[in-house]
Amino acid sequence: MTFQQHTPALRTGGFTFKQFFVAHDRCAMKVGTDGVLLGAWVPLREETRILDIGCGSGLLGLMLAQRSGGRFPIDGVELDAAASTQAADNAAASPWADCIRIYPADIVGYAQTATRRYSLIVSNPPYFSPGVDCASAQRAQARYTTTLTHDALLDCAGRLLEPDGRFCVVLPAVSAEDFLALAQRSAWRADIRVDVADSASRPVNRVLLSLRRGGESEINAIALSRTSLIIRDDDRRYSSSFQALTRDFYLSM
């Protein structure tokens, strides 16, 4: 779902938040509900360094920079050249230019050569298996797991995460169980799960996940906290829970 703002005189070619603007006209995937939910929800601690895998326009990095007051260095890795350039431009134009750095790279190669490790990794990853053609190769790269499979994503996150780190993703509900099964086979365990539905009368259509990794005894000791989030009430107004989660970002909240 892509958000449309109806406030007049907003800048075009992107999305205006309360404290920053995200230009996305050069990106295959525009600012949408999935990314905003993840950026607003991710549990933050006293992080050492944050990584956004497949950062696109740089939305998640900007949201996490706002939430942390720019206290933590944030790296974004993006394969698509046009998107990575736009992400860097968005970061440079934001109040947190000093703490965000964008790397135009394939995350698989980056994970094999990077020497730094991260206490928090986030991703709004490709989610469709190959099928119906997209309008462009750029959009297909952003949406389809042919470019970055979930197996490869988990492997890269495992290589780059600190021992006590956290990996957070947003996924379509239809992909979540398969993703969790893959994760468990690679010594990951979900410690937080939020099932998201557009309304109480609609089925869950996206899932927010926080995963941690460790040895067998550590993994078995992790307890899952599972909750739900409804975006709109029956009257189609944003729910109080959704407003509380996103009010620091949306102009309309």
Curated annotation (Swiss-Prot):
GO biological-process terms attached to the record: methylation; tRNA processing
Keyword Cell wall biogenesis/degradation: no
UniProt xrefs under Pfam families: MTS
Primary localisation category: cytoplasm
GO CC annotation terms, alphabetical: cytoplasm
InterPro entries: DNA_methylase_N6_adenine_CS, SAM-dependent_MTases_sf, Small_mtfrase_dom, tRNA_Adenine-N(6)_MTase, tRNA_adenine-N6_MeTrfase
Reaction(s) the record says it catalyses: adenosine(37) in tRNA1(Val) + S-adenosyl-L-methionine = N(6)-methyladenosine(37) in tRNA1(Val) + S-adenosyl-L-homocysteine + H(+)
Subcellular localization, as worded in the UniProt entry: Cytoplasm
UniProt keyword list: Cytoplasm, Methyltransferase, S-adenosyl-L-methionine, Transferase, tRNA processing
PROSITE patterns: N6_MTASE
Source taxon at top rank: Bacteria
Xref: CDD domains: AdoMet_MTases (cd02440)
GO MF, any single term: tRNA (adenine-N6)-methyltransferase activity
Entry's EC annotation: 2.1.1.223
Similarity annotation: Belongs to the methyltransferase superfamily. tRNA (adenine-N(6)-)-methyltransferase family.
Record's function text: Specifically methylates the adenine in position 37 of tRNA(1)(Val) (anticodon cmo5UAC).
Protein name per Swiss-Prot or TrEMBL: tRNA1(Val) (adenine(37)-N6)-methyltransferase
Organism (species): Dickeya chrysanthemi (strain Ech1591) (Dickeya zeae (strain Ech1591))
